[in-house]
Amino acid sequence: MAMFYAHALGGYDENLHAFPGISSTVANDVRKYSVVSVYNNKYDIVKDKYMWCYSQVNKRYIGALLPMFECNEYLQIGDPIHDQEGNQISIITYRHKNYYALSGIGYESLDLCLEGVGIHHHVLETGNAVYGKVQHDYSTIKEKAKEMSTLSPGPIIDYHVWIGDCICQVTAVDVHGKEIMRMRFKKGAVLPIPNLVKVKLGENDTENLSSTISAAPSR
């Protein structure tokens, strides 16, 4: 029987498969599903739009573009997600408004060691270009790139993930903000917003807690 553990609930296990938001005993390719169900309610996977989801656990960053489905009901972290045959394929992890991610083997992904480096997430505004850690109109960015080209590159200190309606990018910069590396994903996506976790405190008491988008790193 497949088991899934939410990182937001302390379920990270380095001995299991790890995907954004979950550790699991199986590695499900969630790109193949067009319909999923939660508590016997069916939901269609959104076409040509994705959610960039990520966990930060034990100084490890696990990020990926994941499929998502629309649901007007409130679904809680850890709720089981099944395929049309009734097999559990994932659990609820991240959401953006009325959209919920389907975590597992997704599309483009990023797995990093965060020892000595930071990572930052941004919404890429429509019409803007990117250089390193800044976004602006194309002409401004072109001048910025020209200016920074005179500097010698240094070690990477920060990664920046840019999520836009039509394209997503990852850049890496040195201490001066010079761009050292760039990746482009030709897919439009959204960033998740914090979900709510209902935690049982006592025999008859519950409290709603706002979870972080990903599990807090170990200290």
Swiss-Prot record:
Active site: H17, Y138, K142
Substrate binding (site feature) positions: R60, I105, Q169, R182, R184, K186
Catalysis performed (reactions): 2',3'-cGAMP + H2O = Gp(2'-5')Ap(3') + H(+)
InterPro entries in alphabetical order: Poxin_vir
Its job: Nuclease that is responsible for viral evasion of host cGAS-STING innate immunity. Cleaves 2',3'-cGAMP which is produced by host cGAS following recognition of cytosolic DNA and blocks the subsequent 2',3'-cGAMP-mediated activation of TMEM173/STING, which normally spreads to adjacent cells and activates the interferon and NF-kappa-B immune responses.
Sequence similarity: Belongs to the poxin family.
Record text about domains: The substrate binding site is formed by the N-terminus of a monomer and the C-terminus of the opposite monomer.
Name by which UniProt lists this protein: Poxin
